[in-house]
Amino acid sequence: LYSVIAHDLRSPMGSIKMVLNMLILNLPAEKIGDEMYELLTMANQTTEDVFSLLDNLLKWTKSQIGKLNVVYQDIDVVEVVDGVIDIFNMVAGLKKITIREEKPEKLAVSADIDMLKTVVRNLISNAIKFSNENSEVLVKLEEKDGTAVVSVQDHGCGIDEEGQKKLLHTDTHFSTFGTNNEEGSGLGLLLCQDFVVKNGGKLWFTSKKGEGSIFSFSLPLKK
């Protein structure tokens, strides 16, 4: 049922998202005024959040009922992360957030590229959501102990100890709000953990309330 609802709602929401993205790109505040631009930005952010939630819900449900299989292929993690960052630069710019990247020339793994993109998208989206304005999100890629490690660090609200205990557990509900009151359901992180484990890796995090969080995952390097 969840997958049917998410699928039926995702397409029209995607169309609305595309229109709002085009309006923001072509209608700067100087043209329509600060108040109207702020309303447009809020509508765009809300639509992005709803679309992301529907997309995560659809993938999570399919994964749980065994309808998502891992399709292994040779992937350069650096190339995948670069592509996701390009997509999120505009979203980050709306909060005056800079995405900085530290990376080697190449990190080769054998994994499902769609699942990998979903994980990176969710982690970067969350980092932007929970970062303060005029701050930086650091995306670090490195080779460590035979694995490719990707870490996404924000300088935002962080998670308290009680919240950390609930995160990444399907039997506990954890939701919170971003620095601009963007809603977070916790579903995206559960999906990230599921996809990383399915590809033979692991996901972990460190966080401190009021200072920010670092979410990391590893995948075995291509042999």
Residue locations for each model-derived region?
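Short alpha-helical segment of the dimerization/phosphotransfer core of two-component systems
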Residues: 42-50
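Conserved catalytic submotifs in the C-terminal HATPase_c
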Residues: 71-76, 93, 98-107
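Short conserved segment of the HATPase_c
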Residues: 159-173
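A conserved beta-strand-to-alpha-helix junction within the catalytic ATP-binding
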Residues: 71-86, 117
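Primarily the dimerization/phosphotransfer
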Residues: 1-25
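Conserved micro-motifs of the catalytic ATP-binding
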Residues: 65-70, 108-111
